[in-house]
From Swiss-Prot:
Signal peptide: 1-23
Record-linked InterPro entries: FAD/NAD-bd_sf (IPR036188), Glucose_Oxidase_domain_2 (IPR027424), GMC_OxRdtase (IPR012132), GMC_OxRdtase_N (IPR000172), GMC_OxRtase_C (IPR007867)
Coiled coil, from the record: none
Subunit structure: Monomer.
Positions bound to FAD: V129, V280
Organism of this sequence: Malassezia sympodialis (Atopic eczema-associated yeast)
Subcellular location, record wording: Secreted
Name of the protein described by the UniProt record: GMC oxidoreductase family protein Mala s 12.0101
One GO MF term attached to the UniProt entry: lipid binding
Active site: H556 (proton donor), H599 (proton acceptor)
Highest taxon, organism lineage: Eukaryota
GO CC field: extracellular region
Co-factor binding comment: Binds 1 FAD per subunit.
Family (UniProt): Belongs to the GMC oxidoreductase family.
Amino acid sequence: MKGIVSWAVVSAALVLSATESLAFANVSSFEKRTTTGNGWDLDGKSYDYVIVGGGTAGLVLANRLSANQGTTVAVIEAGNSGYDDNDKFVVPDANLYNSAVNTQYDWQFHTSSQKHMNNRRASWPRGKVLGGSSAVNGLYYVRPSETEVNVWSKLAGGSGRWSWNSLLSGMKKSEHFRGPVKSVQNQLQIQYNAGSHGSNGPIGTTWPAVTYDPVERFIKTADSMSGAINNDPYNGNNHGTYVALSSIDKTNWQRSFSRNGYLDPISKRSNLHVLTGHTVTGIIFDRSGKNAQATGVHYAASSNEASHTVHANKEVIISGGAINSPQILQLSGIGDKNLLNGLGIDVVVDLPGVGENLQDHVSAGMSFKPKNKKDAGPTSVTGDAKADSYVNSAVSYTSLGKLFNNKDSILGKIQARAKQIADSHNVSPAVKQGQSKAYNALADTIFPSKVSPVEILGNVMFGSISIQAALQHPLSRGSIKITSKDPFAYPKINPNYFAENLDLVLLREGFKLIREMSQQSPLKDVIDFETVPGDKVQTNEDWENWIRSAAGTEYHPSSTCAMLPRGDGGVVDENLKVYGTSNLRVVDASVTPIAMSCHLESVVYGLAEVAADIILGN
């Protein structure tokens, strides 16, 4: 992860562990423990709902759908449970100082060679454990803006089911918010609106129990440059500067994530069974009716292990995330018929949008040597719960007008290019039509608004002060495509970074703003000098060359099973049902038709809560 490892490790400590194995005789006589690693425990059994993926969204669904004791639910997760290595997940700063990137605990995905990033292959770590990426991310809890969520709703069909008010309700349902400790509140001058938050949900949110001087200086400097402190960024306007919440449970200062929030409290439900360490290799369909009916799934521990089958009485729900969900659909015969036919896969539903529309927050970080070591934050896990609760969370979501002296000029370029981009893509006519509508919405609604095109993040860690910039609404579009029938072979991941040069221009201006911040008081008073990229980078060309060599993922891929009308290349409808099927849904970040200007955890929790209500008919 050259060029980004110093700051990206904050959200990429991927750790797995062994899990207990318990035998289950049948669905009606569960053991008291719901989690097993033995594939035979589900083999041949039938459940009302089979959930593919025990990650951020999957465990929300497992909890809500199994609340009725008369409803049986099975979850199949490729990773292990993580219970034996619990501290690596629940200690917040363990994600900084005990990283498992590029180990067995990491999916170890990589992109294809990126033409516009010096042909580099970027590392794409993803959580492979119960809880998914909510178990291993940087703990940022940031919500999107009302403007972009309503654009999502309109693109999806306009029924209002996915309006801001609907998603906000789901996000609040998932949250139990607690205010900051007084010392941190006073130092960082934190103000908040408790009414914007949930108080009884499974996921704890609060601010870390300690903070560091550069965090305060970052906030004050950003405020002095823009005058945009936001004291209520969770109620539909996330623009401005603030210290974001972290997904931390204030009662014990531990990470709050989907496993310990949604699964552990219900671990004795006799109607819920969670299988870990097994990969779903394909969905089984009955194709005798008008629409294909999902009747179950095949799964296995590895390509060398026995294949098993579990049956679904009501529905199969895919919650594999932006990479694995389109992969599973394609392996099961749902996707672009040309791709599937070329691999010898029987076409169940010709849906050319599967795997298309991939969007990611591309980012990089600048680093600065602090004048005093004490200003560089922690360097290891201490064993003190409050001290170890510190994670980076200072952010500034800056508008187009703050990045460019002439906002109208850059906006005009974006709007002109938006009318042309889709036609340049080698995709089906339906996908092209949907992309064209999305581009027009970005150009005409999102970019002219206060919705931020670039996020600035202030970090202290590893003896350094670093500030990161991340593009929030990329114009470039990529794809996820399988390359073989082998379910254990990784798909081709092509985010197509900087295929649209305007993405590079937007991010470039973000870094120029960061340099300006570093040279302004009070932040400059704790900085000795800039170490990365250093003073050799001065011209626009210098900046762009450095970005191409240093940029990577901010770990927020989305939109590969887009919620759009089928005629616009959509994969799921507003009920999250896959087109051409009667009972197959996708519930995860892959369904958002456009990227959101936030860290995705809050969106996925809210989305899954809304999805559960839809499935249950609430």
